[in-house]
Amino acid sequence: MTSQYAGELCTLLVEDNFGELFARIFSTLNRYDRLSFSRLKFYSRLSNAQLRHGLAAMIQQHLVYHYTSYDDGITYYEPNMQSAYYLVRSGKILELIEHRLGKYAATVMSTIMFLGHAQVGYLETLPALRPSNSDVNRASEERGGIHETEEYHGEEARQETEEHRETEGRPNGLNSDYTSSERPALLHPTLKALAGHGYILRVRDAQFQSYADNALDAERTIKSRPDIKALKGKKLDEAVTEGTLELLKERLDGDLTRGLMFNGVPRGAKRRHTTGATEASNKKARVDYAAVDEDEDGGEENEWSDDDFGEDTIPMESGITVRINYEKLDVALRNRRFLELAERDSSPVTAEVYESLLRRIEYQTAKCRDTTEIPREGEEGEHYSVPVPLRAVVEDVDLFLDLAGSVGPMEVSQPINRRGKRPLEETTNGAAHDGTNGGQSDGNRTYEVDQHLCLLAQPPYSLTSKRMVSGLITWTVEFRHLARKLRHLELERIIEARYGDVALRVVRVLHDKGKLDEKRLQEISLLPFKDLRQVLASMQTGGFVDLQEVPRDALRQPSKTIFLWFYDPDRVGNSVLEDTYKAMSRCLQRLRFERSRLKEFLEKTERSDVKGNEERYLSEAELTLLGQWRAKEALLLGEVARLDEMVAVIRDY
């Protein structure tokens, strides 16, 4: 993100969220990239006090990296473009957290996002994080839910009603010196839920430095070790590379999920359990699927329920400093795009089964890509997710979903004899034996979930992949394949919108066949030469296709030259990404201009006595103007959010 328009966009985001001082420092660092304090002061034309206060606050917000050189002892500063860009994605992140963990969790997440990073002890003192009675009641009501939800129990959600009474309203199980004003009842369970899902992480010192500075520092440390100095040649290079990567991982690791996960699921996540009939042996049809149930039912997973860990009253350590884990949130947002892709050609039931698989995979996936650079088309290897056992997916799927009806007609349980009648069921004193039938029904459910996942594994998207691990059926997702598919669909959508369906057909042919001359391209695409040439010329002007000249001799005469048309998805993706940055920055600039035109009117509407009472204090003309402004603002911000989806697909996923 070092291009002109990306830097312009990040500067606008910083100015819109933090003000002119932050924007001036950030734009100066973006222009000159890496500066010492004295040079930054010279270029920004700021005083010492302004610059020191601004840098301290920007480091708090992770908008600026700083590194003190070992050679001269000078501290250098450089902009954190990625963190600045994530300001535009904050609304989607809070919406995702509220959907999964509730409104109070979104409030906690918003507070941490506003502070940049914060100690748990400081969060305990904030009045905004003391839950209201509605939050407490909502947390206690969610205990009986069937769908997978994260919940907080009523006994843990009591809080003090009178501030001067320090000994009342204590949650059960805590020490006598505890007061609800010191530790809000819902704060620590919420922080544990956020940490268990990986949405927040511990702040480490190395996170305030750029990856390049951390890599150089780690390499210098590894080379100074006596055992490394004894090596030479190729072994030395391999040892330094391996040691540097391990040291980098150790220094940058801020994972807080250790101790908060159980069998790959965060503690407190609502789980559905099958009936006890699954323990019965199943010797009938679909033995393989019933065997999956029998092998895994006897393990530790069925021994754990939500109530075992729901009443965890042990608070988090007050000295831990936490921040937002944007890489993990990118994984959650990417899974949501995969789910939208599955909903195009599958039933809602199949999409819900796929959501259960993606949720399991998300818990064990730290980030979207191991490398920060976007890999070129064809050069990135296949990258599969962790294998998820079929039985784990079955447990997470809603018990009331009609799995069989959405796949096909239900099978006849018993054959009909020659007389057209069904045989009598085996009964004892008029009562049927239901032990075997219970096991068979659970085996049928496992089989039906597997059939839904098999439907998702079919072309053209191949959303899932089936594997056998130690004799057990597991399912995975091929991330790089689906990420490429999302990029191709996004680029094809843009081409079709700009140049029509004929251009889309030509691009698909070039992408599938490679470089083609005009005659061969016309034969495959079945288009008239006139239409084909017009489409190729317009797309070449827009930069979506290009032409390569291959001379047959050294004279390079046009009559003896082959002209090959080709489509490069990488180059087109980079061009579209730059255009998207430019469009987002223009939307923000337009929004700022519209605000400046209505500055006095907007200041009036934002007054504390007017806000919420617009009909009382504003005239009819002012109400009309306010409605027009809100519609225009929603239009521009909605366009920025839509463009951010394109950036995420092309760059992040």
UniProtKB/Swiss-Prot annotation:
One of its GO terms (biological process) is DNA-templated transcription. Pfam families: HTH_9 (PF08221), POLR3C_WHD (PF22536), RNA_pol_Rpc82 (PF05645). Keywords: DNA-directed RNA polymerase, Nucleus, Transcription, Zinc. It is found in: Nucleus. The keyword Zinc-finger does not apply. Residues 293-311 have a biased composition (Acidic residues). InterPro entries: POLR3C_WHD, RNA_pol_III_RPC82-rel_HTH, RNA_pol_III_Rpc82_C, RPC3, WH-like_DNA-bd_sf. GO terms for cellular component: RNA polymerase III complex. Component of the RNA polymerase III (Pol III) complex consisting of 17 subunits. DNA-dependent RNA polymerase catalyzes the transcription of DNA into RNA using the four ribonucleoside triphosphates as substrates. Specific core component of RNA polymerase III which synthesizes small RNAs, such as 5S rRNA and tRNAs. This is DNA-directed RNA polymerase III subunit rpc3. The gene is rpc82.
